[in-house]
Amino acid sequence: MSSDEILMVLINQVEKLQQDKDFDKANQLDDFIYKWLGLSDLKRCSLQERGFSLDTYLVYLHNRACLYLNQLDIPKVLNSVRLFRYFCPSNMIYGDIGISVAICEADVDMRLGKTDNAKSRLYDLLERTQNPYHLARINRMLGELENPYLQFDGIKGNLEQLSQALGYAEKMRDKREIAETYLNIGNVLVSSHPALGLSMIWQAQIIAERNGDSHQVLSAKLSRTCVDIRLMLKYANRGVDMSVFEKDAKDVVLSIDRCKLQSDVEKAFYDECRGMVLDDDESLYEALGFFRTHHAYGKVFNIAQNIAWHAVCKKDFLTVRKILDVCYDAAVKMNDSVKIKAVLQAMKQFKDL
């Protein structure tokens, strides 16, 4: 076998391990490949001398970015993207594999809370591809970016983007992308049409269950729980009976066995949800630790806010002041002036308590 053929066998093996959610072995094999290819020292990394084709190298770096994006390992995703850009000729930057890598970059921007960067990147990509798979992902991400809970006039635009995404996904018969888009449509609709939004999330869960995708089933369940919480907060002071939503949220959280979750990412999302539903600070701190380690500053800010609120309710002002420092750091990392201003005001309020 040639060096190229051996590399493709190893790439496919990593992909299979990732599909099986065996991330420990996938990461170990990737670490071996990375060192074997000499990517830690680009001055000594010669493709032709070692018998590798450029195309195979680019496939490896693309897959590596996706592998670590699925684990929220932002530094390794960005390292893979940087190496891809280093090796990729200018005429391939906007080919299919180049577009896919750029979508990964936009996903990283979203997770870091850099929404303006993500939008700019995605709208640029929208003009550069006709691939239905890429169009489905781009439109879905753009629909997700306009946060309907903060910007109600953006809902119509969100649905237009997501409807296009659903059309592309159905055209490809990509069940995973279809379920993901239903999930996002549900999250958009729930603020104005709660019953319809929840039905879309249920539909996403049903599709994922039929497809045997345990990760996506979990995502739908936790999304349902977050919607229940939002509805309880929205109608808390309006005399509406929220017991149905409260029961559903608790039932979902308690039905999930954390020990059976297959990856650290799944456990972190579960911990966040459990912490919010059951007022469990220990779970919230577990989630906070994971997302801080992986530089997911949007998540860090939201979870720290929840911990701070619990501490305020307990009049534990020392914890409030400590956790506001975490909020401030996350807001600065996101370069979000609105959040920075809000945290500084809160710090001033609790300074002498």
Annotated model-derived regions:
Residues M1-N12, K16, E286-L353:
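C-terminal non-catalytic interaction modules
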Residues M1-Y34, D55:
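N-terminal leader/linker segments that initiate helical-solenoid repeat arrays
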Residues D4, D55, D96, Y133, ...:
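Residue signature of alpha-solenoid helical repeat architecture, marking inter-repeat boundaries
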Residues M8, F52-D55, V59, D96-S100, ...:
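Residue register of alpha-helical TPR repeats
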Residues E15-Q28, A65-V77, A106-A118, E144-L159, ...:
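Short coil/turn connectors between adjacent alpha-helices in alpha-solenoid helical repeat scaffolds
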Residues D31-C45, V81-S90, Y123-N131, L162-D174, ...:
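Amphipathic alpha-helical segments of tetratricopeptide repeats
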Residues E127-W202, I206-A208, D213-S214, S219:
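Solenoidal tandem-repeat scaffolds enriched in leucines and small polar residues
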